[in-house]
């Protein structure tokens, strides 16, 4: 049996993290690897494309119905999906009441105690990355996830979130074994996106693992609650996800301790690539029309 690889996909909300991770994991399963997905996002959408389901019952919701987590059996919380991928969603409380990160902590403890990680090649944590509270940092803080892959794009806030996640990895890297595996750029077709992604990776001391091109077939597959790997296995996009999976598979043990940058350095990078045209503070807060009038 191969040694267990514990990876995590982090990223800004809405960046396509869950879609990217599920397609990557479907490709890994297609390669013959045994996969467990632990969804750590309150939306509980980390497994929907693998299970063809709107949302999986979460550990916290099932525990509430049963009385406590101790009253649950592993078979009740774990569902089997595409290519025998095992799926679990941690869940969280109602919006506005309590800490959603509590579900992450409760779930991982329950899974470990009940042998969920046995006979598995990969366990993948799909984590909301622009929330930096301790609960969501749990896979990093408790040395559960060894390799972190950050899904980002060429958008300012996606890069900002990637840098913030890198700060979290740096904080716990010395006390545990967590490392940054690399960045995955989920294309949004912004200006000079590939250049920016490669530059940010370089500044963080890591690599751009893969640049995933934008393709409407991803949305077509999602509407049918399927990964592209399953929905259109012969498509160009499916092969992109297979290439990404291959890169992740071959990246074991190659993670690094990141070197996060400051907000000023991030803005400087945008200026270097012509996204922000000048450092002139007088232009801050000016509309496009106002700037055009000034330059006329």
From Swiss-Prot:
Give the cofactor note text.
Answer: Binds 1 [4Fe-4S] cluster per dimer.
Known post-translational modifications? The reversible ADP-ribosylation of Arg-102 inactivates the nitrogenase reductase and regulates nitrogenase activity.
Which residues of the sequence carry a binding annotation for ATP? 11-18
Query: Which key words tag this protein in UniProt?
Result: 4Fe-4S, ADP-ribosylation, ATP-binding, Iron, Iron-sulfur, Metal-binding, Nitrogen fixation, Nucleotide-binding, Oxidoreductase
Q: Which Gene3D superfamilies match?
A: P-loop containing nucleotide triphosphate hydrolases
Q: Which family does it belong to?
A: Belongs to the NifH/BchL/ChlL family.
Name assigned to this protein: Nitrogenase iron protein 2
Q: Report the source organism.
A: Azorhizobium caulinodans (strain ATCC 43989 / DSM 5975 / JCM 20966 / LMG 6465 / NBRC 14845 / NCIMB 13405 / ORS 571)
Protein encoded by which gene: nifH2
């Amino acid at each position: 049996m191969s040694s267990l690889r514990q990876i995590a996909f982090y990223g800004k909300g809405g960046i396509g993290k869950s879609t990217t991770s599920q397609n990557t994991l479907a490709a890994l399963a297609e390669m013959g690897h045994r996969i467990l997905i632990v969804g750590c996002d309150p939306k509980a959408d980390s497994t929907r494309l693998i299970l063809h389901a709107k949302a999986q019952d979460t550990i916290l919701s099932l525990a509430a119905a049963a009385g406590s987590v101790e009253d649950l059996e592993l078979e009740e919380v774990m569902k089997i999906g595409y290519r025998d991928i095992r799926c679990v969603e941690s869940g969280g409380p109602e919006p506005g009441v309590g800490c959603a990160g509590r579900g992450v902590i409760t779930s991982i403890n329950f899974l470990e105690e009940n042998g969920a990680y046995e006979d598995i090649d990969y366990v993948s944590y799909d984590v909301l990355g622009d929330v930096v509270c301790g609960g969501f940092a749990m896979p990093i803080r408790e040395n559960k996830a060894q390799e972190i892959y950050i899904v980002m794009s060429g958008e300012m806030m996606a890069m900002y979130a990637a840098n913030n996640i890198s700060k979290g990895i740096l904080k716990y890297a010395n006390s545990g074994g967590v490392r940054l595996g690399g960045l995955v750029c989920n294309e949004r077709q912004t200006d000079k996106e590939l250049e920016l992604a490669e530059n940010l990776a370089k500044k963080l001391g890591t690599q751009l693992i893969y640049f995933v091109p934008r393709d409407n077939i991803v949305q077509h597959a999602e509407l049918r609650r399927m990964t592209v790997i399953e929905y259109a296995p012969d498509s160009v996009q499916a092969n992109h996800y297979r290439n990404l999976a291959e890169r992740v598979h071959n990246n074991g043990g190659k993670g690094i301790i990141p070197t996060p940058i400051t907000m000023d350095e991030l803005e400087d990078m945008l200026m270097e690539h012509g996204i922000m045209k000048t450092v002139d503070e007088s232009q801050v807060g000016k509309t496009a029309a106002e700037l055009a009038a000034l330059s006329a």
